[in-house]
UniProtKB/Swiss-Prot annotation:
<keyword id="KW-0441">Lipid A biosynthesis</keyword>
<dbReference type="Pfam" id="PF02684">
    <property type="entry name" value="LpxB"/>
</dbReference>
<dbReference type="InterPro" id="IPR003835">
    <property type="entry name" value="Glyco_trans_19"/>
</dbReference>
<comment type="similarity">
    <text>Belongs to the LpxB family.</text>
</comment>
<keyword id="KW-0444">Lipid biosynthesis</keyword>
<dbReference type="GO" id="GO:0008915">
    <property type="term" value="F:lipid-A-disaccharide synthase activity"/>
</dbReference>
<comment type="function">
    <text>Condensation of UDP-2,3-diacylglucosamine and 2,3-diacylglucosamine-1-phosphate to form lipid A disaccharide, a precursor of lipid A, a phosphorylated glycolipid that anchors the lipopolysaccharide to the outer membrane of the cell.</text>
</comment>
<dbReference type="GO" id="GO:0009245">
    <property type="term" value="P:lipid A biosynthetic process"/>
</dbReference>
<keyword id="KW-0328">Glycosyltransferase</keyword>
<dbReference type="GO" id="GO:0005543">
    <property type="term" value="F:phospholipid binding"/>
</dbReference>
<keyword id="KW-0808">Transferase</keyword>
<comment type="pathway">
    <text>Glycolipid biosynthesis; lipid IV(A) biosynthesis; lipid IV(A) from (3R)-3-hydroxytetradecanoyl-[acyl-carrier-protein] and UDP-N-acetyl-alpha-D-glucosamine: step 5/6.</text>
</comment>
<protein>
    <recommendedName>
        <fullName>Lipid-A-disaccharide synthase</fullName>
        <ecNumber>2.4.1.182</ecNumber>
    </recommendedName>
</protein>
<keyword id="KW-0443">Lipid metabolism</keyword>
<dbReference type="GO" id="GO:0016020">
    <property type="term" value="C:membrane"/>
</dbReference>
């Protein structure tokens, strides 16, 4: 890639603006920053990022959790603050004049910001396509106006943008590059101190506080029902920060014994598990990549669900099912997301070794399909825009 890094870039400091709005974007942003630093001797990063991006020397102007909102009701409640942050970011970036701005996911926040910056002559990239194939398709045209390039992580997304002659590049997902095709479950268990002869369930109630509030209690009730069938069951709960841990403990309120883990990545914990109970989102992708059987669940505010049901026109919400184009893993949404439903499906999964074999084979095929050296490709796209 060194051939696309002109020598002029080595004689001045390159400024890159970058905004991620949640934990999954923080992971992608950190990988991109790390890769760009390999090719640019003098480079600085400003915007909004979480602990992963900040560990790569990015200067974050706001706490990433301020952007991590979900559902109609919560967005309305926090809208004044979100609008203030976006206005302030636009002002700061216009004054800073970064060589490139990258908005990672969070389309409702980032597309408008990208549009303002592009009008001021700042090159822009949107990293992770919004779900235009599911709802609000007109965002395609907003992206066309707001960006110089779109980096998509799912294979079928590129065709959508190609149809409208919008610059777009399929790069896969950096987690697919990071996670081995053949995960070592024995080693993963040893690191966590889990005996080889016990059942292990990973419980992932989400990265947002609202998700934890909606799902944590029922997830643990499900785990308790599961423990009645598997008395030696070990329950692991990966959570990323103290705010999430405190909320989980306050909401959980059940007598079942569990272990909260914050020093390991979610995928390392799921690699050690026999099955996972997962909130819809990036965690379903991580679970697929470590070849762990899963049950997917989601619940949202009733008003948000009513609106979503009216506008969204896809049969599945989990990434494994979307990638496969058919149901690979069971999904339980809203009123179907009940502990007894989740527990019975997990019991069936744990008792069906043949299903494990079929799932793991399919998961491996899907892993291959998005293992495309994403960080390098994303960095290449950024470097091409730097004048």
């Amino acid at each position: 890639m060194s051939s696309i890094v002109p020598s002029m870039h080595n004689n001045r400091t390159i400024i890159i603006g970058i905004v991620a709005g949640e934990a999954s974007g923080d992971i992608l942003g950190a990988g991109l920053i790390r890769t760009l630093k390999k090719y640019l001797k003098k480079v600085r990063f400003f915007g909004i990022g979480g602990p992963c991006m900040q560990s790569e020397d990015m200067k974050s102007w706001y706490n990433i959790e301020e952007l991590s909102v979900m559902g109609f009701a919560e967005i309305v409640m926090k809208l004044p603050r979100l609008l203030y942050i976006r206005r302030n970011l636009a002002r700061r970036f216009i004054n800073l004049k970064p060589d490139v701005f990258i908005g990672i996911d969070s389309p409702d926040f980032n597309i408008s910001l990208e549009n303002r910056l592009k009008k001021r002559g700042i090159r822009t990239i949107h990293y992770v396509s919004p779900s235009v194939w599911a709802w609000r398709k007109k965002r395609i045209f907003a992206l066309k106006k707001a960006t110089d390039n779109i980096l998509v992580i799912l294979p079928f997304e590129k065709k959508i943008y190609d149809h409208f002659n919008i610059p777009c590049q399929f790069i896969g997902h950096s987690l697919a590059d990071q996670i081995p095709l053949n995960p070592n479950k024995v080693s993963a268990r040893q690191k966590l101190g889990i005996p080889h002869d016990v059942y292990c369930l990973a419980v992932l109630p989400g990265s947002r506080i609202r998700e934890i509030k909606m799902l944590a209690h029922d997830f643990l009730v499900c785990a308790k029902l599961l423990k009645n069938n598997f008395p030696n069951l070990e329950i692991l709960v990966p959570l990323t920060n103290q705010t999430s841990i405190k909320k989980f403990i306050s909401v959980a309120s059940t007598s079942v014994k569990y272990r909260v883990l914050s020093n390991q990545s979610a995928w390392e914990i799921m690699m050690a598990a026999d099955a996972s109970l997962v909130t819809a989102g990036t965690a379903t992708l991580e679970c697929m990549l470590v070849k762990c059987p899963m049950v997917v669940a989601y619940r949202m505010h009733p008003l948000t669900f009513m609106l979503a049901k009216h506008f969204i026109n896809i049969p599945w919400i989990s990434l494994p099912n979307l990638l496969a184009g058919h149901e690979l893993v069971k999904e339980f949404i809203q009123n179907n997301c009940r502990p007894e439903n989740l527990a019975q499906t997990l019991i069936n999964l744990l008792n069906n070794n043949n299903q494990h074999i079929v799932l793991k084979k399919k998961f491996r095929q899907l892993h291959h399909s998005i293992r495309c050296n994403a960080d390098e490709q994303a960095a290449y796209a950024v470097l091409r825009l730097i004048k």
